[in-house]
């Protein structure tokens, strides 16, 4: 077997890029950066197997309708740039729209790829008249943005936001500890609004997919038992704790003279088991380790 040289490998990849341009084939790359052109336009830089692909902002499908002008333009661009900053390292699809053979520079559209996927997965139907993605279906999604209490995913050409309460039945303080941009996750599509191809919206959750969510862990706790756990949130004097054995717990009282804070490790004593809500209720006997 002959070993492929780096130059030959580059030629094969360039051929894939040219095929995307001629035949409209979808390619997938990694969002590497955001730049301003000398004329002040924003372009998104995508890496495709070592080649630099430029995608103009209007081809990123981050907004619908015309770009606002005048006083509204600056806040709009600030919002776009902050969205793009959270999307760094995300996996995105694109179709090549133009290329320069000598300079090997490429311009592409994410919008074209997303519309193609929407048509295939949401609008085209099989013999029974059912599209590939329907309500209740579990599908793989790409994580394209993560904040403390929210996840942004792309499901075959449609973006959607999943809030913390829909991520898991277990309580956690920060989604960034569990998810990162570029991950692939299984989601359940809950609702689909198939207005027209440019305005398809969905809601989805991860909570109903993870089977651990359905079984209550309460039998791992006994009354008057003491357990170690970590504080996930503190709201209105109520402390929310994820015990190390997997049980969700709530404390209204803390015997430690210090105030518990997020991510503190605490010792928790169970005073009541709330079967209906699937949580343990009790008191924090002491703070084992503060997260300062």
Predicted regions and their residues:
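Single-stranded RNA-binding regions, centering on S1/OB-family and related RNA-binding modules
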Residues: 1-292
């Amino acid at each position: 077997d002959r070993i492929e040289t780096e130059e030959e490998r580059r030629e094969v990849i360039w051929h894939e890029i040219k095929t995307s341009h001629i035949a409209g084939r979808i390619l997938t790359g990694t969002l590497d950066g955001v730049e301003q052109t000398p004329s002040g336009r924003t372009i998104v830089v995508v890496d495709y197997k070592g080649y630099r692909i430029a995608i103009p902002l209007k081809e990123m499908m981050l907004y619908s309708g015309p770009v606002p002008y005048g006083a509204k333009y600056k806040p709009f661009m600030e919002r776009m740039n902050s969205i793009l900053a959270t999307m760094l390292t995300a996996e995105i699809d694109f179709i090549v729209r133009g290329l320069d053979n000598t300079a090997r520079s490429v311009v592409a559209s994410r919008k074209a790829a997303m519309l193609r996927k929407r048509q295939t997965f949401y609008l085209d139907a099989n013999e029974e008249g059912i599209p590939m993605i329907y309500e209740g279906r579990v599908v793989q999604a790409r994580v394209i943005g993560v904040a403390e209490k929210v996840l942004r995913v792309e499901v075959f050409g449609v973006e959607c936001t999943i809030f913390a309460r829909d991520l898991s039945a277990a309580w956690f303080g920060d989604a960034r500890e569990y998810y990162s941009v570029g991950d692939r996750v299984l989601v359940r599509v809950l609702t689909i609004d198939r207005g027209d191809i440019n305005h398809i919206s969905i809601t989805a959750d991860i909570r109903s997919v993870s089977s651990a969510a359905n079984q209550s862990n309460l039998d791992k706790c006994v009354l008057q038992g003491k357990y170690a756990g970590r504080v996930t949130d503190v709201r209105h004097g109520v402390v929310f704790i994820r015990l190390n054995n997997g049980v969700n717990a709530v404390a209204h009282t803390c015997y430690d003279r210090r105030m518990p804070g997020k991510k503190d490790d605490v010792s928790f004593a169970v005073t009541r088991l709330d079967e209906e809500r699937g949580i343990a209720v009790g008191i924090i006997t002491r703070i084992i380790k503060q997260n300062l």
